[in-house]
Amino acid sequence: MLQALMGKIFGTTNDRELKRYRQIVNKINNLESKYKALSDEALKSAFNEIKESVLSGGKSLDSVLVDSFAITREASTRVLNMRHFDVQLIGGIVLHEGKIAEMKTGEGKTLVATLPIVLNAISGKGVHLVTVNDYLASRDGNEMRPLYEFLGFSVGVILENMHDPVVKREVYNADITYGTNNEFGFDYLRDNMSYSRENMVQRGHNFVIVDEVDSILIDEARTPLIISGPTNRTLRDFKDANDIALKLLKDEHFSVDEKDKTVLLTEEGITRAEELFKVENLYSPENASLSHILDQALKANYLFEKDVDYVVNNGEVVIVDEFTGRLSEGRRFSEGLHQALEAKESVEIKEETQTLADITFQNYFRMYNKLAGMTGTAQTEASEFAQIYSLDVISIPTNIPILRKDLNDLIYKTEKEKFEAVIATIKKLSATGQPVLIGTASIEKSEILHEVLKKEKIAHTVLNAKNHAQEGEIIKNAGAKGAVTIATNMAGRGVDIKVNDEVKALGGLYIVGTERHENRRIDNQLRGRSGRQGDNGTTQFYLSLEDSLLRIFGSDKIKSIMERLGVEDGEYIESKMVTRAVEKAQKKVENMHYEGRKHIVEYDDVANEQRKIVYKFRNQLLDPEFNISMKINEIRAEYVAHLFANVSIFNGGVKEDFNLEKLFKLIHEEINLELNPADFASYEYEELLEVLTQKIKSSYDEKMSVLNDSICSEIERELYLKELDSAWREHLYAMDNMKTGIRLRAYNQKDPLVEYKKESFNLFTELVEDIKFNTIKTLQIIQFRVEDPEEEARRVAEKLDIQRKMNEASIQFNHYQSEMENESKKISRNDLCPCGSGKKYKLCCGKSGPKKGVFAS
């Protein structure tokens, strides 16, 4: 209240910033006549002078902004026949300053982006424009290409089906690169899994503009980018677990919490499951896989809905993006959940995967020197943008005032009554020819409406995840006279819905929302499809107490209001009090999701520091100039000191107390080198360390002396990389499992995040040692045929090369399965877990206490 009052008196921060931007815009406008008078060649020459002044170090990008924007606007007018409005110039300045420009639908964000893109491309370090799908990346990149090329810049577009690293590298080396968030992120991960510099495609992270920034940095931030490969988990029991899950009774055998998305087995449920599985203890080590798979089967059946969370498409379970309604082809749920869904739907159960490399969008985009974004809906998440990304949100006024009418919500008691009212409204509007766009929250609801409209013989088009390939055309035509369009979660963002004068006379595009989304931004995006660039239009939401949001989060208060007002069946209430109650429920969910995203980024920040260290060293290994032999010599000395510590030989100790027999037995076991303790009995610690290190080095040098230096270096480099990748993969497993269980420490009055940081530091120290020492051990024991060592070395190098090429091509890693001689024998905490996850028992099913189905999203 006080803040709002102060804003009215002194003006808000947003108002003050807009005032500053308008002063810069005036300077740009003052140059318009100057550049308009120039010929094309003279305009290009003027721009080249600006480029030279920046590249020579004489001027900064900020100092040439006014001239660059003025020239870009003039070039756009000539080449694209599109002139930037003043508000678009403001948007461009906001983006250049590394902020978020909130601009309403239809305000021309694609054209706005050209201003900061051109300015920042001058540096020669590359500019990335990120969009939500290939269609928009290709459309925007190619539509703006003539402008960029007129000003002397090269343009590239990264597409999902682009696999050739040579072609991709050329695209990334362009001055300006358009692409999707997924492709940029996955290319970064693939680069850091590559075994040669030739297969790496990205060249750095200078400046990025994220289109639909709220969708990418907020909505998709809960889902990390993951590259995965196969595990050795058996696929048996998924079908049996599904059958058993269906036999268990809700509330008696397990409880479901939709709000927190958890399924918990009760004591009765555990007993019943043991009877059905015919085992004595569901949580004993030998049954570890059964308890895990049953948990996933329960989630699949009671938390995940077909045509809401996923669809079955051509015999495959495909995830539906909850924010866009699009199919997420290629993505799979982890931890066996996808297999559980496949068992539920009776389709082929595919092999489970393990994480090979991952990164969150938060940490990927924070790598850029400068990050900016644009969207029509950002203010509701302004605090999150500021706290996580250090991004300010600037709301930019529309070029023409908005004439759209946003009517109050209509709330019915039941979903049936609500849909009857929606159909009546559609029939009424359709009869007049006024176009209607109906927004639904799921594929299931869009199919219900589709069937009813078919019965009513009302011509219409459906846009959901099942036909998203045509979304651009469907959305584009949604403003035509008489058009009735059903769209799930407002897929088709980035495509304008234009209306002609005849439609404007009928009242413009009418938006009908059939359900409030958990997030207000999604609702605002739906509203924003109508009334673009000063067009008229109307929006209204039809709700019921049976809607997911109201049922889970807010229906009690609203229900009591309806009862007090005496609302009869078929009647609705239209009240600001109720609308506020709905928004309060939405804020509750938004806050819950924000805490989830904050939780993810806090934990991933820990992993991210480790990731940066590992990837930095990995890139050093790939550098042909990196002296790998010197590095091997360094870690060999560390390895010998490590062996000393293992047998309690320490600096300052008495040499007579050195247990050389134990030391040399360990050396023989680890690197197959025979040594006589009597030959070393007279050495003090430092001498012993130096002599033994030299002895091990001499043994290695003698073996490798038959090879030329380049082959030696190649083998050392390939083996080091292989050990690094293998250890990093297992480290990701350990970190992921530790993160899952660390929350329990809160019960012991300990901060889980602090504990996670401590534990992860210890794990990382172990990781670094494992990589170094395993590399030394492998290099020491590797042998070549005596007849032709050069040929054998080439064969080894070629084998390594083939393996890494397979890794790069299919992201598949060799894995070995070991059968336990006796499944019921006692399992050591450091043994591999019998559930087949590939993790140590102590980090998987051996964690204290039975797992009872806590949902892992």
Swiss-Prot record:
Where on this chain does Zn(2+) bind? 833, 835, 844-845
Q: How is the cofactor bound?
A: May bind 1 zinc ion per subunit.
Q: Which reaction does it catalyse?
A: ATP + H2O + cellular proteinSide 1 = ADP + phosphate + cellular proteinSide 2
**Which Gene3D superfamilies does the record associate with it?**
Helical scaffold and wing domains of SecA, P-loop containing nucleotide triphosphate hydrolases, SecA, preprotein cross-linking domain
Q: Which Pfam families match?
A: P-loop_SecA, SEC-C, SecA_DEAD, SecA_PP_bind, SecA_SW
InterPro entries (alphabetical) = Helicase_ATP-bd, Helicase_C-like, P-loop_NTPase, SEC_C_motif, SecA, SecA_DEAD, SecA_motor_DEAD, SecA_preprotein_X-link_dom
How does the record say this protein sits in the membrane? Peripheral membrane protein
Which residues does the annotation say bind ATP? Answer: 88, 106-110, 496
Can you supply a Gene Ontology BP term from the record?
protein import
One GO MF term: metal ion binding
Q: What is its EC number?
A: 7.4.2.8
Annotated Gene Ontology cellular components are:
cell envelope Sec protein transport complex; cytosol; plasma membrane
Q: Where in the cell is it found?
A: Cell inner membrane; Cytoplasm
Q: Which UniProt keywords apply?
A: ATP-binding, Cell inner membrane, Cell membrane, Cytoplasm, Membrane, Metal-binding, Nucleotide-binding, Protein transport, Translocase, Translocation, Transport, Zinc
> What cofactor is needed?
Zn(2+)
Its family remark reads: Belongs to the SecA family.
**PANTHER family given for it?**
CHLOROPLAST PROTEIN-TRANSPORTING ATPASE, SECA INNER MEMBRANE COMPONENT OF SEC PROTEIN SECRETION SYSTEM
Quaternary structure, from the entry = Monomer and homodimer. Part of the essential Sec protein translocation apparatus which comprises SecA, SecYEG and auxiliary proteins SecDF-YajC and YidC.
Q: What's its job?
A: Part of the Sec protein translocase complex. Interacts with the SecYEG preprotein conducting channel. Has a central role in coupling the hydrolysis of ATP to the transfer of proteins into and across the cell membrane, serving as an ATP-driven molecular motor driving the stepwise translocation of polypeptide chains across the membrane.
**This protein's name:** Protein translocase subunit SecA
Q: Which organism is it from?
A: Sulfurimonas denitrificans (strain ATCC 33889 / DSM 1251)
